[in-house]
């Protein structure tokens, strides 16, 4: 889908469909009134017939509206007068696209810029609108014998006044890059585990580097991981025929001597649970256990498209967790790259084992800050559901920055405590720590475990178990989150 920004008068713009907002109570805003006046009152006449009340998300299609260059006019309900919430604005955008995609026109022009969204300026509301519209075009039918018909709608024109055109163009450009990154993340997450594995993710990273010469990729194989002493990482992979990979992405868009930000992604391409085998029901969704790594790749896709003046390193800790005669057993003790020993009480708590060695590896980059992203705990879904990612860390300023990025990107996170008292749940009589902390506060104790490997830099942990994918039903699939949050965080850090 192509996004175009124009400051043309909607009354004189030639388009297949002109989209106009109508408030609850059939109220027309300034733009809608001007269009209605040019059309000899055709819009207000249609509203008087009572076919559209103006509630959020309602639509009404008008054909052959006089004196307009548009072939048809789509009226979209915008709710009560005043500021809209992000959720309401997204509902309006989704309803707009839902109506447009069923029409015959190849383009449409939107006059939704005058709608007010709480806490958002022209840039903020335009980006939210553009991201919602673009993300709605996503489809994954790679393995369907019959492909979905190509969408007729090819171009969306965002109409604005000349004074705000630069901000609207900037927002549209950022939205396109973010949604492109989300699409890559969703594609990788939706791939079946027989085709998506550590070596294939390494190939994806290399392909991205071929497209953008500002990205360098290094892939550390099993031999190199052994040389580095990554005993925790290797323990996860030893039950699988798929070899592990630590994929290092290096983007240098800032000054050479500028410390980078490091994004660490959990990349368990299939998580059976290992010897601590998961229940069979829903196990197919454990292909999504690599969505942390996929979101880092997607964020890099957006970062590269935007060419941000910032240095960023990505670490994708990729392995497959399978049961076999060579698999790790409950009770095994392994030595991590940091030298700390871990008693593995549950082989299904494997994500933290690959991450802990990746976090130690991150020290060599002398980072400004490190954020790890992982589908780490089912407990996070219990605590926060699917609306917000869990957030913990060791630096208040970094936590605040991540929370703010989530709010600005409408991809929210919520902070959970990381009190010292929780650390005691990881005590082991045989090793420096256990890899689980019992049934209570599972999301927090998982973060406590990771915190022991992130003491030498500012660190934040995003648990995306509830936000990375949608379970079951027609909407089942990867969401692309938290690419918007992560990209916003980097946009904020690269702002002059």
Swiss-Prot record:
One of its GO terms (cellular component) is cytoplasm. It catalyses: Release of an N-terminal amino acid, Xaa-|-Yaa-, in which Xaa is preferably Leu, but may be other amino acids including Pro although not Arg or Lys, and Yaa may be Pro. Amino acid amides and methyl esters are also readily hydrolyzed, but rates on arylamides are exceedingly low; Release of an N-terminal amino acid, preferentially leucine, but not glutamic or aspartic acids. GO terms for biological process: proteolysis. Its EC number is 3.4.11.1, 3.4.11.10. Mn(2+) 2 binds at residues 266, 271, 289, 350. Pfam families: Peptidase_M17 (PF00883), Peptidase_M17_N (PF02789). InterPro entries: Leucine_aapep/pepB, Macro_dom-like, Peptidase_M17_C, Peptidase_M17_leu_NH2_pept, Peptidase_M17_N. The active site is at 278, 352. Mn(2+) 1 binds at residues 271, 348, 350. Presumably involved in the processing and regular turnover of intracellular proteins. Catalyzes the removal of unsubstituted N-terminal amino acids from various peptides. This is Probable cytosol aminopeptidase. It comes from Azotobacter vinelandii (strain DJ / ATCC BAA-1303). The gene is pepA.
């Amino acid at each position: 889908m192509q996004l175009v920004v124009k400051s043309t008068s909607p009354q004189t713009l030639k388009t297949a469909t002109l989209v106009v907002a109508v408030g609850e109570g059939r109220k027309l805003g300034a733009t809608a009134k001007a269009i209605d006046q040019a059309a000899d009152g055709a819009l207000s006449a249609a509203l008087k017939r009572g076919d559209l009340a103006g509630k959020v998300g309602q639509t009404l299609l008008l054909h052959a509206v006089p004196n307009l260059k548009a072939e048809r006019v789509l009226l979209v309900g915008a709710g009560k007068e005043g500021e809209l919430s992000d959720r309401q604005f997204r509902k309006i955008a989704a309803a707009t696209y839902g109506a447009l995609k069923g029409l015959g026109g190849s383009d449409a022009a939107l006059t939704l810029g005058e709608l007010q969204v709480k806490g958002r300026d022209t840039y903020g509301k335009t980006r939210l609108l553009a991201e919602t519209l673009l993300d709605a075009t996503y489809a994954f039918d790679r393995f369907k014998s019959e492909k979905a018909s190509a969408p007729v709608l090819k171009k969306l024109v965002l109409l604005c006044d000349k004074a705000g055109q630069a901000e609207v163009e900037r927002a549209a450009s950022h939205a396109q890059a973010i949604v492109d990154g989300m699409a890559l993340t969703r594609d990788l997450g939706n791939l079946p585990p027989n085709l998506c594995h550590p070596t294939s993710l390494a190939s994806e990273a290399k392909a991205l580097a071929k497209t953008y010469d500002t990205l360098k990729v290094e892939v550390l194989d099993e031999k190199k991981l052994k040389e580095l002493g990554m005993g925790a990482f290797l323990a996860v992979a030893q039950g699988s025929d798929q070899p592990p990979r630590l994929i290092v992405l290096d983007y240098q868009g800032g000054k050479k001597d500028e410390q980078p930000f490091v994004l660490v992604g959990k990349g368990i391409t299939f998580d059976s649970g290992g010897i601590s085998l998961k229940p069979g029901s829903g196990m197919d969704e454990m292909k999504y256990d690599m969505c942390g790594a996929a979101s880092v790749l997607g964020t890099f896709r957006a970062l590269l498209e935007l060419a941000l003046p910032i240095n960023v390193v990505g670490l994708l800790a990729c392995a497959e967790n399978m049961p076999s005669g060579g698999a790790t057993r409950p009770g095994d003790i392994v030595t991590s790259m940091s030298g700390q020993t871990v008693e593995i009480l549950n082989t299904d708590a494997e994500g933290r084992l690959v991450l802990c060695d990746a976090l130690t590896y991150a020290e060599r980059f002398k980072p400004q800050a490190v954020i790890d992203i992982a589908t780490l705990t089912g407990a996070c879904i219990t605590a926060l559901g699917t609306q917000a990612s869990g957030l913990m860390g060791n630096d208040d300023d970094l936590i605040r920055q991540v929370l703010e990025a989530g709010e600005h990107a409408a991809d929210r996170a919520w902070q959970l405590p990381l009190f010292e008292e929780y650390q005691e749940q990881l005590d082991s009589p045989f090793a420096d720590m256990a890899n689980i902390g019992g049934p209570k506060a599972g999301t927090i104790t998982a973060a406590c475990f990771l915190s022991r490997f992130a003491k030498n830099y500012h660190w934040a942990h995003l648990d995306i178990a509830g936000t990375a994918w949608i379970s079951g039903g027609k909407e089942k699939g990867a969401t692309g989150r938290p690419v918007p949050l992560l990209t916003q965080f980097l946009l904020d850090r690269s702002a002059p």
